[in-house]
């Protein structure tokens, strides 16, 4: 399988099977499942998304958290964090690092825009 196809295959599985939602997900699970070395997985991610494995998984988690905040207003931030495989304090820190605002501020700001 060519690198681009392999990356797309891995990315599709991580997203569609919600592998990112496993708070204990380790890169070993991915490289074993797709029968590639740890080094190859790292190279693949660097080449296609310019990220390390934790950065890649956390970016998907944050994308999903944004979607949940916008489309499921009944869910608390704690529930959203749990659904994306994080503890609420960790999600708040990651979210602020990635988007420059807290999840609550993001939700309130997006709600005002709609």
Residue ranges and their predicted role:
Residues 1-8, 47, 51-52:
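Short, Lys/Arg-enriched, Trp-marked, Pro/Gly-tolerant hinge/linker segments that flank
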Residues 2-6, 34, 58:
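Generic alpha-helical segment signature
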Residues 3, 24-27, 31:
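Conserved phosphate/pyrophosphate-binding and hydrolysis machinery centered on Walker-type P-loop NTPases
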Residues 6, 10, 62-65:
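Short alpha-helical "packing" element that flanks the helix-turn-helix/winged-helix DNA-binding module
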Residues 11-25, 45, 49, 66-75, ...:
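Basic, amphipathic alpha-helical hairpins
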Residues 28-56, 81-102:
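Basic/polar phosphate-binding segments, predominantly the helix-turn-helix DNA-binding elements
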Residues 48-84, 109-114:
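Terminal helix-turn-helix DNA-binding modules in bacterial transcription factors
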